[in-house]
C-alpha cells in the first residue's frame, strides 16, 4: 500500500473507531441528546452543544445501535478545511463542545493517542511484511487488527519509533532475548514446571553467563537464567529491581540469545525456528490503558484454570471433539522474601513457556488462525482457508456459519458446567482443513471465569484461584447475569461481530444477514445444551428475551484514567439494546 493511501486509510479507520466508540457509549450524550433526521436518503445524527453543530452520517447496525457511515463525510459547522477529517480533530471538537465535562477528561492524552494510533497504523499498512509460515502470518493479521473497535489500540504508550519498528509483528522484525539471572532462593514456579525446558532455551549463552557470574564471585548453580524482553531489560528492570540488583538477587547479564518475533499480544514471543513454541515475558509498555505485565498470580490462576478446562474436555463429548488446549504450566517468577504474590513488582520478572498441541504443530495440512486475525480487513487468510482467490458470497456465508457454530457450541458447552474461557479473538484459535473448522484451540488461561453454583451442581471442584479478598474480582462469579455478561460482550459483541464487520467490508455481505444467521445458530446451540434444570429459562431470558444486553465501555474509562493503569485494561459496563431482538 502506497504511503499516502496508507495514511488516508489509517486516518479513516481510527476516525471510524472513535466515532463508533462515542456512539456506542453515548459519551457526552452524543446519541441521546441528538436529533435523528434524513437528508437525501442518508440518516444523520445532528449533535449540538455550545452553539456548534456536527452532522454525523449513521446507519442502524446489526448490534441495534447507530454506527458511523464512514463512506459519507462528517460535517462540522464552520470547518472549511478540504483535508479529510482526522480522529484527533474530531475528538478536539467534541471536547470543546463539552467544556463542562471535558475539564475532567484526559483530553490531551486521548488526542496524543489518536495521533500516534493513526501514524503507527499507516506505517503498518504501508510496510506490512507477511511471514511465509501461515500461523505466524495469522498472528501478524491479528496484531494489525488489534482490539476491535478501540480507537487507541494502535498506541503502545512508552515506545519510541524505533521500538515500534522492532516489536510490532506486522513489520516482521525478529530480535534476540536478553538474560537476567535470578537467585533460586527468590524464585517460584508452576507445580509441574520442568526446569530443563527453561535451561534448554538459554544453552547457547550458559557458558558466558557462568563466566560473568564467576567474575562477580557468584556461582551459576545458585541462579536460574530468565529470558527477558530487550525493552524490559533496558527500561524497566534496572529501576524496578534496583534493590535486588544491588543485593545480587537479580543479575542483569548483557547476553543475547535466540531469534523471536512478537505475536499479536506482544508479550508472547514466537520462536522463529519453532513457531508453535512461545515464550511469554513481561513487556511493561501501556496498551489499551494497561501495562503489559505477566503477574505471578495470573500464571498460578492459569495453571488452575487449565486443569479445569482439561477436566471438562474429558467429561464432555462436544468439547472432546473440538477443543485443544495450549500447555501453559511451565512458568517461573521472581518472588520476594515476603512471599507477597500480589506485589506489582513480580509481574515485571516472570517467564512462561507456552506449548501448542503437538498434533497441530506436526500437521502441515491445517491452518491455525486466531479469530482476531479473521477480523482484519484483508482477504489473504480467507483465501488461504477456502483454498481459492475468488470467494463467493455463498463461500463466505458457509464459512462464517461453520465458525460461529463451532465457536458457540464450544463456548456454551463450557458454560453449562460453569466455566468460561477467555473469549476475545486473540485467545481463541481455529484450526481449518479443507475450508472447515476442525478444532478450537484455547490459549491464555489466566482469566477463565467460573460460576460457582453450576460447577457445584456438576460436582466439580472449584479452581484454587489466588484473588484479593479486599477487592472485587472477575474470576469467581455468584451471579448468573454477570457470568453471561462476559459471553455477551467478549464473544458476541466484540469477537463475532468484529468478524461480521470484516466480512461486510471485504465481501459486501450485509451485516444484518450475518447477524440473522448468528442469532439462529445461537438459538439452536442454546437449545441443545443440558443447562442446569432450574436455570434453563433464565439462560433464554438473559440471551433472547431481555430488552438489553451488557456492553463493554472502553473509551469512557480511559477519559478518566490518571495513572499507568496497572495490569488490567480499564473498562466498564453499560447496557445497550439486545442484538438478538429484531427491530423494524
Swiss-Prot record:
It comes from the Bacteria. InterPro entries: Aerobactin_biosyn_IucA/IucC_N, IucA/IucC-like_C, LucA/IucC-like. Pfam families: FhuF, IucA_IucC. GO terms for biological process: siderophore biosynthetic process. GO terms for molecular function: acid-amino acid ligase activity; ATP binding. Induction: Up-regulated under iron-deficient growth conditions. Repressed by Fur under iron-rich growth conditions. The keyword Transmembrane helix does not apply. It catalyses: 2-[(L-alanin-3-ylcarbamoyl)methyl]-3-(2-aminoethylcarbamoyl)-2-hydroxypropanoate + 2-oxoglutarate + ATP = staphyloferrin B + AMP + diphosphate + H(+). Keywords: ATP-binding, Ligase, Nucleotide-binding. Pathway: Siderophore biosynthesis. Its EC number is 6.3.2.56. It is an enzyme of class 6 (ligase). Belongs to the IucA/IucC family. This is Staphyloferrin B synthase.
